[in-house]
Amino acid sequence: MVDVAFVCLGNICRSPMAEAIMRQRLKDRNIHDIKVHSRGTGSWNLGEPPHEGTQKILNKHNIPFDGMISELFEATDDFDYIVAMDQSNVDNIKFINPNLKGQLFKLLEFSNMEESDVPDPYYTNNFEGVYDMVLSSCDNLIDYIVKDANLKEG
C-alpha cells in the first residue's frame, strides 16, 4: 500500500477536490493499493468540510467526498508521494518538513498543460477550471505511481 497526499493552502478547495477525483479514478481503474489523502499548509480551516464550490463541482460530476474535513500537513506525515498544487505549497511543505522521505511533485507536472500551478479557486472562483486541471493530471499521476511502486492494475 502506498500513500499519496495532495496539498494546498487551506485544504478546502484544491487538495480535497484532487483527493476525491483521484479516489474516483482509482476506483474506476480497479486499483486498490493506493491510499489517497489531502492536507493543507495553513491551519485556519482545520476540521472544515470542502468549500461549497468544491462540493458543488464534485456533486455535478457525481464524485463522492463524504466525511472529508480539512487537515494540516505536519512534519510527522509520512507519505510516499506528496503532490502540491503550486510552488508556494512546495515551499511550505519543504519548510514544514525539510527531511521529506516521500517524492514531492506539483500536480501539473502530470498534465499536458502549459501552466505549472493550479490557481486557488477560493480567490478566482473558477472551480470548473480547477476540476479540469486536476482531472487531466490524475491518470498520468496514477500511471506514474503504479509504475514507480510496481503496483498492479485491476
From Swiss-Prot:
SMART domains (alphabetical): LMWPc
Gene Ontology MF annotations: protein tyrosine phosphatase activity
Leading EC class: hydrolase
Keywords of the record: Hydrolase, Phosphoprotein, Protein phosphatase, Secreted
SUPFAM superfamilies, alphabetized: Phosphotyrosine protein phosphatases I
InterPro entries according to UniProt: LMW_PTPase, Ptyr_pPase, Ptyr_pPase_sf, Tyr_phospatase_low_mol_wt
Entry EC number(s): 3.1.3.48
PTM characteristics: Phosphorylations at Tyr-122 and Tyr-123 are essential for phosphatase activity.
Compartment(s): Secreted
Cellular compartments per GO CC: extracellular region
Presence of keyword Translocase: no
Catalysis performed (reactions): O-phospho-L-tyrosyl-[protein] + H2O = L-tyrosyl-[protein] + phosphate
Active site feature: C8 (nucleophile), R14, D120 (proton donor)
Oligomer status and interactors: Interacts with host CORO1A.
Protein family per UniProt: Belongs to the low molecular weight phosphotyrosine protein phosphatase family.
PANTHER family to which the protein is assigned, alphabetical: LOW MOLECULAR WEIGHT PHOSPHOTYROSINE PROTEIN PHOSPHATASE, LOW MOLECULAR WEIGHT PROTEIN TYROSINE PHOSPHATASE
Role: Secreted tyrosine phosphatase that plays a critical role during infection as a bacterial effector protein that counteracts host defenses. Required for intramacrophage survival.
Protein name per its UniProtKB record: Low molecular weight protein-tyrosine-phosphatase PtpA
Species assigned in the record: Staphylococcus aureus (strain bovine RF122 / ET3-1)
Gene behind this protein: ptpA
